[in-house]
């Protein structure tokens, strides 16, 4: 299967909110032609559009007062600003009435309070609310959801286990999950996410949990 001639690959740091915003709106962006124009070209002949916002940072893994300011800023830019900017851009660029599905990958940390995750949890809660607001706006042929994927064995988990226990009280819990085989594989989780996106249940609730389906 050959990729569309309208496909252009762009390398951009999603944690740099200013750079992403400039690329989406400004033809003078150092990343080349403006992203808004590229999106319109890419989506021009689309029969259906799917946007998945998965990129995220879990740092700072630390209680308030022990967090690095740079990590707070980076996490909010990557976890919140980037998904909102991309969702807004795709909504603006999609051809009229073409079906659009927007999936944010959320977290149980956005729905329950955990010591040491005031930044990560807050950022994931923001995506839950963004999905709710999209539903409240009643965009025609648009479905949106924020899905908590469960606890998955990824590099993010390794980063959590490497955190400072004195600053992150939950470190021991995640070390135990790894040692006791309590983590889902990335491949199994990806397959479940794909099945969820293709199901009739996608978009019926703004904040969903993959463990409620399997």
Predicted regions and their residues:
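Catalytic loop of short-chain dehydrogenase/reductase
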Residues: 99-126, 131-139, 148-152, 158-161
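Conserved mid-core segment of classical short-chain dehydrogenase/reductases
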Residues: 28, 47, 57-73, 92, ...
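C-terminal helical subdomain
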Residues: 146-149, 154, 162-214
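Conserved Rossmann-fold cofactor-binding substructure of NAD(P)-dependent oxidoreductases
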Residues: 15-43
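Rossmann-fold cofactor-recognition segment
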Residues: 4-18
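A short, exposed helix-loop element centered on a Lys and neighboring polar residues
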Residues: 87-88, 132
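Active-site loop of short-chain dehydrogenase/reductase
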Residues: 45-49, 93-108, 140-143
């Amino acid at each position: 299967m050959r990729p569309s001639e309208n496909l252009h690959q762009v390398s951009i740091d999603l944690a740099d909110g200013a750079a992403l915003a400039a690329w989406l709106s400004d033809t003078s962006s150092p990343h080349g032609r403006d992203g808004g124009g590229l999106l319109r070209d890419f989506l021009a002949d689309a029969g259906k559009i799917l946007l998945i916002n998965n990129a995220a940072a879990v740092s700072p893994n630390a209680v308030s007062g022990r967090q690095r300011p740079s990590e707070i800023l980076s996490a909010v830019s990557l976890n919140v600003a980037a998904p909102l900017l991309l969702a807004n851009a795709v909504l603006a660029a999609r051809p009229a009435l073409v079906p659009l599905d927007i999936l944010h990958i959320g977290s149980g940390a956005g729905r329950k309070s955990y010591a040491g995750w005031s930044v990560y949890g807050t950022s994931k809660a923001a995506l839950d609310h963004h999905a709710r607001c999209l539903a409240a706006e009643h965009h025609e042929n648009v479905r949106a959801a924020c899905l908590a994927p469960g606890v998955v064995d990824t590099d993010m988990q390794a980063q959590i286990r490497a955190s400072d226990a004195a600053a992150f009280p939950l470190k021991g819990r995640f070390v135990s999950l790894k040692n006791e085989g309590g983590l889902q594989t990335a491949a199994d989780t990806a397959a479940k996410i794909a099945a969820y996106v293709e199901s009739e249940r996608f978009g019926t609730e703004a904040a969903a949990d993959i463990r409620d389906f399997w």
